[in-house]
Each structure stands twice: as structure tokens, then as C-alpha cells.
């Protein structure tokens, strides 16, 4: 029991005496995460012709949605479009 109290007080003392140590780690994580996600978003947000090859799990946690649309108003030709969406 005394040993567990010692360890609790020891860790509290470390966290209290060196808060900048914990803050530095959090800042590093915050700095690297947006860069990684931004790169992923740029490579993933593209129009697709199908949802078959969802490289790198680009749509996760969303889903790949496909639909057909006409090429122009006067045309009867339809084109299949796919995109990652929340719904």
C-alpha cells in the first residue's frame, strides 16, 4: 500500500514539475496530424468512375457514392460519377 502511494505521488510530482514536457508532446502530435490528413484529403478528394478501387481507404469513414448524370443538357449520353460522401 505504501509503495502504491509512493508511485502515485511520484508521478504527480513529475507531471507537476515538468508540465512543459507533456505540452511539447501534445504540440508535436497537433502539428503532424493536420499535415498528414491534408495530404490524404488532397489525394482522396477526386471524382471517380467507380468505387471498386478505393485506394488507401480514402472514403473511410464515409462511403463511396455513385450516380449517373448527363454530359450536357442537349445530350442523352450519361456519365457515371463517384465521390466520397458522409451520406
UniProtKB/Swiss-Prot annotation:
- Gene Ontology MF: a single term: toxin activity
Query: Which keywords does the record carry?
Result: Calcium channel impairing toxin, Disulfide bond, Ion channel impairing toxin, Knottin, Neurotoxin, Secreted, Signal, Toxin, Voltage-gated calcium channel impairing toxin
* Compartments where found: Secreted
Q: In which tissues is it expressed?
A: Expressed by the venom gland.
Give the signal peptide as a residue range, or say none if absent: 1-17
Disulfide bonding pattern of the chain = 44-59, 51-64, 58-84, 66-82
> Source organism's superkingdom?
Eukaryota
Q: Which residues form the propeptide?
A: 18-40
| Secreted among keywords | yes
A Gene Ontology cellular component where this protein is annotated is: extracellular region
Q: Briefly, what is this protein's role?
A: Modulates Cav2.1/CACNA1A voltage-gated calcium channels (P/Q-type currents) in rat cerebellar Purkinje cells and hippocampal CA1-CA3 neurons. At saturating concentrations (>10 nM) decelerates activation kinetics and slightly increases peak amplitude without affecting deactivation kinetics. In vivo, does not cause death when intravenously injected into mice. In rat models, through its activity on Cav2.1/CACNA1A, has an ameliorative effect on memory defects provoked by hyperstimulation of N-methyl-D-aspartate receptors (NMDARs) in the hippocampus.
Q: Which family does it belong to?
A: Belongs to the neurotoxin omega-lctx family.
Comment text on domains = The presence of a 'disulfide through disulfide knot' structurally defines this protein as a knottin.
| Misc remark | According to the nomenclature proposed by King and colleagues (2008), 'Gsp(267)' comes from the species name 'Geolycosa sp (strain A267TDLS2-KZARNA)'. This species has been reclassified since that study, as indicated in the work of Oparin and colleagues (2016). The primary structure of the mature protein is identical to the fragment sequence of Omega-lycotoxin-Lp1a from Lycosa praegrandis (AC P0DRA9).
Q: What protein am I looking at?
A: Omega-lycotoxin-Am1a
- Organism equals Alopecosa marikovskyi (Wolf spider)
Recall the taxonomic lineage recorded for the source organism: Eukaryota, Metazoa, Ecdysozoa, Arthropoda, Chelicerata
Amino acid at each position: 500500500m505504501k509503495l502504491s502511494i509512493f508511485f502515485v505521488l511520484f508521478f504527480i510530482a513529475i507531471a507537476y514539475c515538468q508540465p512543459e514536457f507533456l505540452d511539447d508532446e501534445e504540440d508535436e502530435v497537433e502539428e503532424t496530424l493536420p499535415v498528414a490528413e491534408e495530404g490524404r484529403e488532397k489525394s482522396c478528394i477526386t471524382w471517380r468512375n467507380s468505387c471498386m478501387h478505393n485506394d488507401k481507404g480514402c472514403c473511410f469513414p464515409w462511403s463511396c457514392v455513385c450516380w449517373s448524370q448527363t454530359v450536357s443538357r442537349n445530350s442523352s449520353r450519361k456519365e457515371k460519377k463517384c465521390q466520397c460522401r458522409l451520406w
